[in-house]
Amino acid sequence: MTLAEIAEYANVSIGTVDRVIHNRKGVSEKTKAQILAIIDKYGYKPNVIASQLKSNKAFVIGVLLPYLETGDDYYRALYEGMSQAVAQLSPIKIELKLVTFDRQISGDAIKKSSVFFDGDENAIDALITTPVVQDEIMEIVSKLDGKPFVYIDTPLGTTQPLLTVVQNPYKGGYCAGRIMRMFQGGGKFACITMYSSGYNLRERVRGFTDYIQKDAGSVVLDEICTDITELGFYKFMKDLFERHNDIKGIFVPHAEVSLATYYLVDQGLNSRVTVVGYDLVEKNRQGLLDGSIDCLIGQRPEQQGSEAVHKLYQACMLHQHVPSRIDMPIDIYFKENII
């Protein structure tokens, strides 16, 4: 119920209800108890639009993400989900203040995020981020001075966000291992990542390895390629297969799966080497269609971004309880089930 509806139901003035809600003096105990009983039974929904019109102030959400084009546009999909949520909540005035950083440059997230703390003009009311560089994100959220923050894509258990919107990374990797075994049975497999750190990535690799190594005769190579150019990755794959020409499958636990396929296609290996990876970004979608990628695990980035904005709105503007975690499903894509 709105403030006006509660007042009408209780046969009192709006001002009286407002005093009770904000625990101010000037209301008899009998009237206060009556109003609180109505709120307890029917709930209270603030008139956010009226409040914003009165204050003429938008609710500003800082968004801190790796460069949107990295991850083959995976991070762009996260941000697009947030933008869609803002549009859906119109005419509520919510503003996204986007800051992006290079996750491969140490300290860049801290440096770029300083704009959020640079005086009242750039102040934010809440923050949405992905803790892909954990130590830096921990330092950044410690500066928020009690303002709410939400994690998407990657959890970080040593802090206390309002909400975490993620897929379980270990289960995702475990599922990838099960799929790989369905294609290839046992043998030698390689997990290839392009980043030396990242909780999500390590957990996916761990899950994949645990499933594959249920077969005592199977081996999983844990490989990192830090040169993420097409040429650099091609050379890395060439060296890997010269050292291990009996690899039967490749698992890439992040969105840049297509980079792993160039060498395989060029050398005619894609017919015998299974490729399982993450995220239905456009390049990977095309890889499924042309057969260079066998299976993808999706984690609904647009929905993650949308949930983050909607839950901040509910918690901060409607003062409603929101869950501390939302788990994204493990979506599995083959060539035959994408549109």
Predicted features, each with a name:
Residues G62, K188-I192:
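Conserved beta-strand elements of the Class I
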Residues Y67-Y74, K97-A109, V165-G172, C191-Q213, ...:
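Hinge/beta->alpha junction and helix N-cap segments in small-molecule ligand-binding domains
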Residues I38, Y211-I212, R300-I339:
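Hinge/cleft segment of the Venus flytrap/periplasmic-binding protein
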Residues V132-K171, V281-L289:
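Flexible loop/hinge segments that line or gate small-molecule binding clefts
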Residues I124-D145, F208, T226-K283:
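Hydrophobic alpha-helical
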Residues M1-S55:
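N-terminal helix-turn-helix DNA-binding module of bacterial transcription factors
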Residues T164-K188, F233-Y234, N284, R300-M317:
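Hydrophobic alpha-helical segments within soluble ligand-binding/sensing domains
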Residues P46-D108:
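Amphipathic helical "hinge" segments at domain boundaries
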